[in-house]
Structure formats: C-alpha cells, structure tokens
Design a protein with these regions (language model features):
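Electropositive phosphate-/nucleotide-binding environments in soluble metabolic enzymes
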Residues: 6, 36, 51-55, 88, ...
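Amphipathic, alpha-helical segments enriched in basic
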Residues: 3, 7, 14-16, 69, ...
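Predominant activation on well-ordered alpha-helical scaffold segments within soluble catalytic domains
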Residues: 59, 92-96, 112, 212
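ATP-binding N-lobe of GHMP and related small-molecule kinases
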Residues: 1-82, 100-106, 119
Length: 214
C-alpha cells in the first residue's frame, strides 16, 4: 500500500489577466501543511474508491498510466470549491499513489494537463511538488483567447520563484458552515472570460512591480 499526504494551497491571484501582455495569468500562492489530504492507494483489478469526488480523477489516472485499476481510500481531506485547491491535490495524489503502487514514475508536472490541472495557474502543481510561496510565469498569451484551451492542450507554467516561509508564519482559514461553494467548472470559466475581457494592463504592471521589487 502507498500513502500520499499533501496540504491545501492558498491562491492569492494572478499577475496579469490582460491579453495586451505577452504572458497571461501567472499564479501567485502558497502551500499549507494543513488542512491536508491523505490517501491510501493499492493495486486493484478495477477502479475502486470510497469517495465519489475522487473517482473521476482516479479513472483518469488509471487511463493515463495504462494500468489495470487501483483502490483509493481517503483518510483525510479538506472541502471542495472553497479556494483551497482540492481538485489539483486530489488529482495529483491519485496520480502519485497509483504510479508508485505500480512502480512507475508519477511525473505530476508532465501529466497534470491530462488530468485537467494547470490550465491557468501552476501554483497547485508547484506546491504539490515542493510547497512554499510560489510565483509562476503564466502561459504565452499568443496561445490563448478568453476561452480555455482544450483539456490537456497546455503545459503547466514553469515556476518563476519559490521561497520557503518562516517557520513561525501562520494562516488563519475561516470557511462558512454548510454546503456553500465557490465557482467551478463552466461558472468559473465564464467569470474568468469576463475578467480577461475587461482587464486593465496597467494593473498587471503594478503587480509585477510589487512581486519583483518589494
């Protein structure tokens, strides 16, 4: 059995949402130790999972790796669609666990696009790899319109910078009780299209100054 543990991530936003600049997006965020996701993975003849939210990722992983099947048990997790990056962490945890169970190299950065991850921000992939405070370089604007690319038709943005946070830093997370969730899927895509269509390129210049000079 293989056990994979990873923490949530906080996404602070994007450096640039304007098509006037050569690179679009450019995620900024930080990996957390808690809340965390813990999954147990082992070989199986079919796809078996005790969590319906994980099953689509597990099926995609089994297909991507070309293995017969896998069994995943979720021992600990954090809420979905609450800004903590659960989708990417679930997908990459399944990928890493199944790959290791079969003696394969996970290669999460390379395979994340085939699991639908890293299409805008590379922060979730980068924090899964090594944690820390992360800034990625974004995607080439020339390859993008206000619509997202077809699934898998991208590479995860390279990391521009990664910094280890001081050990005494703490983040206080306050999440509302109940089933309230943030946007995802088509709803999130619509919001992002609107943001890109109306983005002010001058704001990106100000953000770049803050990130690189202060």
């Amino acid at each position: 059995m293989v056990t994979v543990e990873t923490g949530a991530r906080l996404h602070f936003g994007f450096q640039n949402l304007s098509l006037a600049h050569p690179r679009l997006y450019g995620g900024v965020g930080v990996g957390l130790e808690e809340p965390r996701l813990v999954v147990d993975v082992e070989q199986a003849g079919t796809v078996e999972c005790d969590d319906g939210a994980v099953e689509p990722y597990l099926r995609a992983v089994v297909e991507e790796l070309g293995v017969e099947g896998a069994r995943v048990t979720v021992r600990e997790r954090f809420p979905r669609h609450t800004g903590l990056g659960s989708g990417t962490q679930l997908a990459l945890s399944c990928l890493t666990g199944v790959a290791r169970a079969y003696g394969l190299e996970p290669r999460p950065r390379e395979r994340a696009p085939q699991l639908g991850r890293g299409g805008r921000s590379g922060v979730g992939v980068a924090t899964f790899e090594r944690g820390g405070f992360v800034v990625d370089i974004g995607h080439p604007t020339a390859r993008f319109t206000t619509d997202p690319p077809r699934q898998g038709n991208w590479t995860v943005p390279p990391v521009l910078g990664r910094w280890t946070l001081p050990g005494d830093w703490r983040f206080v997370l306050v999440t509302p009780a109940g089933e309230k969730r943030g946007p995802s899927g088509e709803g999130e895509d619509r919001r992002m299209r609107t943001a890109v269509e109306h983005a002010d390129p001058g704001i990106a210049d100000e953000i770049a100054t803050l990130l690189t000079r202060k």
